[in-house]
Regions:
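M16/MPP (pitrilysin/insulinase) zinc-metallopeptidase core fold and M16-derived inactive scaffolds
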Residues: 58-126, 172, 187-191, 303-332
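Non-catalytic, conformational "gating/processing" segments within enzyme and secreted inhibitor domains
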Residues: 202-237, 444-446
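Gram-negative bacterial Sec-dependent N-terminal signal peptides
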Residues: 1-23
């Protein structure tokens, strides 16, 4: 669920001190999104996009259950239920369902038909435009999946004999870095990729399905050039008769704070050494204008830092070094990293180069010229907001919506975004940005080195000593970071360079 250019109508943060000058107005949801709740608690959201008549119609059914709801006897249930559902036709004919799935996956940007994570299960359909018959069949099939999956010895055996089409988030739950990040968290014992134990206990699967697949824990999202009134009526027919109600809420997944000690991790995910200078803070929702402005400010400071370091390396003709920034929200933790890619034999020297530049920015801040150029660039982007929005594909729009829902961020209308953003840019000063930069660069950062498997393990003590010598020569206590200074994929900073 990462990445687009207008990431979108939730982009950055202003400092705590400035918050007192901002009236904490509640952000108003974008009225273009129609939403409602059926009598049984089932929620739906529809965005009609007449400006994108040729785009595919994107449909997502999110169920608030995942591997975290399993006990030890139920391990693998959350993954197996969508696998079971994908082998069934429900109230449709088998030939209809085959045709639906043949056309229900975008050939250019294919998504797995179902994804299971720790706290959600998502069913994904992407339909050709102007195919109301497929849209109706999709809603019917999803309605059957939401409450009418047949769980019998025959259907279970049939599902087990077919290939598993269900993906997980993250895609590789066994990844070395991911397992390290989960240390100290309840998520560690609840792998969404865990296969169901055999022989399968039919009654236990039924009980799990009835307990967690309840309409009051489901949200359907539809984005595309559709007749909203007709779609909403079809949603009522497909999902209105679902039964069940949650007795207990699903557990909320949380990560422990990032461990401060340096670590080297062997992984197949990189081809050369990648050192992440990483920090994280508790994530706070964005429901009021003051929180949005606080976010924008810290986000802009990070972007300024990225471009400053990149340009400095370019001016100095730095060789064998790549720089990138990555910010995201992971289960109630807001996490950022400055990534340094380097050959192993030059890693310590390259860390020294980057650390010296970070220390210089922390001490001196940005120049007025750099600040003015950044604000001018952001103002120019803002002028193109509506054109950018009009070019945003439906699959991007629905992905942004899902991220906003997961991170409790209010999606606001482009008009409100433009006004708030312009006021923010007009009120910003170089002193504000530099104060935020000093704050961010005074935090404790963990050194996390990803190394290709088979490479000799790097001595992390050497890297930590280099870092400490430059960044903490007096071992001064680290400043406390702002609690809500970043939001997943709401940054304009490129992920890698």
């Amino acid at each position: 669920m990462q990445g687009t250019k207008i990431r979108l109508l939730t982009g950055g943060l202003l400092m705590i001190a400035a918050a007192s000058y901002v009236q904490a107005d509640t952000l108003q949801p974008d009225p273009a999104w129609q939403q409602g709740t059926l009598a049984n608690g089932f929620q739906w959201q529809v965005l009609a996009t007449p400006q994108r008549p040729s785009d595919r119609i994107e449909i997502r059914l999110s169920v608030n259950t995942g591997s975290l709801t399993e006990n030890s006897q139920q391990s693998g249930f959350s993954h197996f239920i969508p696998r079971l559902a994908l082998t069934q036709s429900g109230s449709l004919q088998a030939v209809q369902v085959r045709s639906l799935w043949q056309q229900g996956i975008d050939p250019k940007r294919p998504l797995p038909p179902a994804v299971v994570s720790y706290d959600y299960t998502m069913f994904n359909l992407s339909l050709p435009n102007n195919r109301n018959d497929l849209l109706k069949e999709s809603l019917t099939w999803l309605g059957d999946t939401a409450g009418k999956v047949a769980i019998t010895p025959d259907t279970v055996n049939y599902a087990l004999s077919n290939s598993d089409m269900v993906a997980t988030w993250p895609a590789d739950t066994k990844d070395s870095w991911w397992r390290y990040r989960l240390k100290g968290s309840t998520l560690l014992g609840h792998d969404p990729a865990e296969p169901v134990k055999q022989p399968v206990d039919i009654e236990q699967i039924k009980s799990f399905y009835q307990k967690w697949y309840t309409p009051d824990a489901m949200t359907l999202i539809v984005v595309g050039n559709v007749d909203s009134r007709s779609v909403i009526e079809q949603i009522g027919k497909a999902f209105g008769d679902l039964k069940g109600k949650r007795d207990v809420p699903a557990p909320v997944p949380t990560l422990s704070p990032l461990r401060p000690e340096p670590v080297s991790i062997m992984t197949d995910a990189v081809r050369q050494d990648r050192l992440a200078l990483m920090w994280d803070t508790p994530w706070q929702p964005i429901r009021e204008s003051a929180a949005l402005l606080r976010y924008w400010r810290a986000d802009l400071a990070r972007e300024a830092l990225f471009w400053h370091v990149q340009q400095t390396l370019s001016k100095n003709n730095a060789k064998d070094i790549g720089i990138g920034f990555d910010c995201r929200v992971l289960f109630q933790r807001a996490q950022c990293a400055i990534n340094v890619e380097s050959p192993s034999d030059k890693l310590n020297a390259n860390l020294s180069v980057v650390a010296k530049e970070l220390a210089k920015v922390r001490k001196n801040g940005l120049s007025k010229e750099e600040f003015d150029a950044l604000v001018a660039q952001k103002s120019l982007e803002l002028q193109k907001l509506f054109a950018t929005y009009a070019r945003t594909d439906t699959d991007v729009l629905i992905s942004q919506r899902i991220r906003s829902l997961q991170n409790q961020v209010v999606d606001i209308a482009p008009e409100q975004y433009q006004k708030l953003r312009q006021d923010f840019l007009n009120s910003l000063t170089v002193e504000m940005i530099n104060q935020d930069l000093r704050q961010q660069l005074s935090q404790d950062m963990a050194l996390v080195l990803l190394q290709p498997k088979g490479e000799p393990e790097f001595n992390m003590k050497d890297l930590q000593a280099t870092w400490n010598e430059i960044m903490t020569p007096d071992a001064a206590p680290a400043a406390q970071p702002a609690v809500d200074d970043l939001h997943q994929d709401a940054s304009d900073i490129p992920r890698t360079q």
